[in-house]
Design a protein with these regions (language model features):
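Bacterial N-terminal signal peptides that target proteins for export
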Residues: 1-3
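Non-catalytic macromolecular-recognition regions in eukaryotic signaling proteins
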Residues: 16-166
Length: 166
């Protein structure tokens, strides 16, 4: 998992960016659910983009597959936690974000150049972005308190559930 974090870290917009960390949040029949965070040294630091291109590639890899719930989504902002009661496995869906863990958050993440990569991810696979054009998910600066590092110095960038090795 560390190698994937370091590859991810090379694709982060830097603003007192310290590194990456993850935590295990659940163990289910669908696998282990991890949350991945970008870490910063100042509580007011803001993450506004995660990007990759030829000179700063990103690898999101897995030895088996990522769990993708049938009613889930590629971006956390489109997951409504009100549906967790009816679809309990939805809370373990794999997704990307900048700060928000569901539709109750403040992040309005946009993307450019990610359609092919997100499609592979939604099919359960990983991807590598290493092209001249690249890809990014991002939000407008100063629009989302969830994108600020806060007291713990962390900004959530994704949740990944797998029965394999990330």
């Amino acid at each position: 998992f560390t190698a994937a974090l370091m590859a991810f870290a090379s694709s982060m917009v830097l603003a007192n960016f310290v590194g990456m960390e993850y935590e295990t949040v659940a163990e289910t029949a669908n696998g282990t659910t991890y949350r991945v965070y970008a870490t910063f040294d100042n509580p007011t630091d803001e993450l506004v983009a995660v990007y990759a291109l030829e000179t700063a590639p990103m690898v999101v890899g897995v030895s088996t597959s990522f769990y993708q719930d049938p009613v889930g989504a590629v971006l956390a902002q489109t997951i409504n936690p009100a549906f967790f009661g009816a679809f309990p496995t939805l809370q373990y869906d794999s997704w990307f974000t900048i700060g928000s863990s569901d539709s109750n958050g403040t992040s309005d993440v946009q993307q450019v150049g990610m359609d092919t990569y997100f499609a592979a991810f939604e099919a359960g696979g990983g991807f590598m972005i290493d092209t001249f054009i690249g890809g990014s998910w991002f939000l407008l600066p100063n629009q989302s308190p969830d994108a600020e590092a806060g007291a713990d110095g962390r900004v959530l960038i994704g949740q990944f559930t797998t029965d394999g090795v990330v």
